[in-house]
């Protein structure tokens, strides 16, 4: 087996990528989330494939086909709950993975980081379109609200929104194309994930100290495979607990009502993992400004490598930057809370302050803190 692992063309690729891959000795549990995201993607593709066998992408039958899956298909309720909650788990792992990248300076590997941002956009698009498919009230009105942002784009906006709609409003054509895109995008995500890994293996993994570790590496298997197995077991425990005991904990009750274009829900909001971006969108009174802020809330991550002013890669020995990082995390929690609240005082003002603080921390405070810390250390 050892000889085949190192000689067979396909086995050799797997060997170099996962088995004999040199890894830094000192990486912590925060480095587990890459493999956990991969596991979430596999679960989502597998459960999604089984759901697609019974789902019908038609406005008249979409809602009843989801009901049919839950009531009549063998273990359909389980597959549907796994798929719906798997998305939440996916985003929890994604956000923790990005947070680790910011904290430990992994953004300095520019190619890997930029592919990661592209992956985030693709996963967000996939999740948004998936939320539309059950054709409940929040599915329909969520699609309507987000699609109505597109006309704000100068010149091409009105044509773009009609092209996405496939008509003059969110209707059958919209649902059909959203289903087609939702089906194909996870495979594009899987391909991009391989490119992400390819770039990562060009430079090697980062480590908590943020310094080169070429002289002190160990093979990925068996050391890190067993370490990651612990993360997998813990995550599966949390996942199955939610799926089997609290399947509707992270969903919206409005989505159990069939879509009705004549009845607007009192409060339209996306899934919890988009609420921070939704809060930033709502905090700007101008439509185009809101759309720009929404895109920049994610795209600002691409500026991290250029805003890095410190001579140290990681935040491990940078207390001022650590403090600012945790303020940023707190700010994101506040934005998530505000995104789920109605548009009325005092939530409007809190959302605007939190949105300004979000960009201020990333664009101003982080670079300034890096310079101050270097000055204190006389570097």
From Swiss-Prot:
GO terms for cellular component: mitochondrial inner membrane; respiratory chain complex III. Its main location: mitochondrion. Binds 2 heme b groups non-covalently. Keywords: Electron transport, Heme, Iron, Membrane, Metal-binding, Mitochondrion, Mitochondrion inner membrane, Respiratory chain, Transmembrane, Transmembrane helix, Transport, Ubiquinone. PROSITE patterns: CYTB_CTER, CYTB_NTER. The cytochrome bc1 complex contains 11 subunits: 3 respiratory subunits (MT-CYB, CYC1 and UQCRFS1), 2 core proteins (UQCRC1 and UQCRC2) and 6 low-molecular weight proteins (UQCRH/QCR6, UQCRB/QCR7, UQCRQ/QCR8, UQCR10/QCR9, UQCR11/QCR10 and a cleavage product of UQCRFS1). This cytochrome bc1 complex then forms a dimer. Belongs to the cytochrome b family. This is Cytochrome b. It comes from Heteromys gaumeri (Gaumer's spiny pocket mouse).
């Amino acid at each position: 087996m050892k000889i085949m692992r190192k000689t067979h063309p396909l086995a050799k690729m797997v060997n170099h990528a996962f088995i004999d891959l040199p890894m830094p000795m000192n990486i912590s549990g925060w480095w587990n989330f890459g493999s956990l995201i991969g596991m979430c993607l596999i679960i989502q593709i597998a459960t999604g494939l089984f759901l697609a066998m019974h789902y019908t992408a038609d406005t008249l039958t979409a809602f009843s086909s989801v009901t049919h899956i839950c009531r009549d298909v063998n273990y359909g309720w389980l597959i549907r709950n796994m798929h719906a909650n798997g998305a939440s788990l996916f985003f929890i792992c994604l956000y923790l993975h990005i947070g680790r990248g910011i904290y430990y300076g992994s953004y300095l590997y520019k190619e890997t980081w930029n592919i990661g941002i592209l992956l985030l956009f693709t996963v967000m698009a996939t999740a948004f379109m998936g939320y539309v498919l059950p054709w409940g009230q929040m599915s329909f009105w969520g699609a309507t609200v987000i699609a109505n942002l597109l006309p704000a784009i100068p010149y091409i906006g009105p044509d773009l929104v009609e092209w996405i709609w496939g008509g003059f409003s969110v209707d059958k054509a919209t649902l059909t194309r959203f289903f087609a895109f939702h089906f194909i995008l996870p495979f594009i995500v899987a391909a991009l994930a391989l490119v992400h890994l390819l770039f990562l293996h060009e430079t090697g993994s980062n480590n908590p100290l943020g310094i080169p570790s070429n002289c002190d590496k160990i093979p990925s298997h068996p050391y890190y495979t067993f370490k990651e197995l612990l993360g997998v077991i813990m995550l599966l425990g949390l996942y199955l607990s939610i799926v089997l005991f609290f399947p509707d904990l992270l969903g919206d009750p409005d989505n159990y009502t069939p879509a009705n274009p004549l009845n607007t829900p009192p409060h339209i909001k996306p899934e919890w993992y988009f609420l921070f971006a939704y809060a930033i969108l709502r905090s700007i009174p101008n439509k185009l400004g809101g759309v720009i802020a929404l895109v920049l809330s994610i795209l600002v991550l691409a500026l991290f490598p250029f805003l890095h002013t410190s001579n140290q890669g990681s935040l491990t020995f940078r207390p001022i930057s650590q403090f600012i990082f945790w303020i940023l995390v707190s700010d994101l929690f506040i934005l998530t809370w505000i995104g789920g609240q109605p548009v009325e005082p005092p939530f409007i003002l809190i959302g605007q302050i939190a949105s300004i603080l979000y960009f201020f921390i990333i664009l101003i405070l982080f670079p300034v803190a890096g310079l101050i810390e270097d000055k204190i250390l006389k570097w």
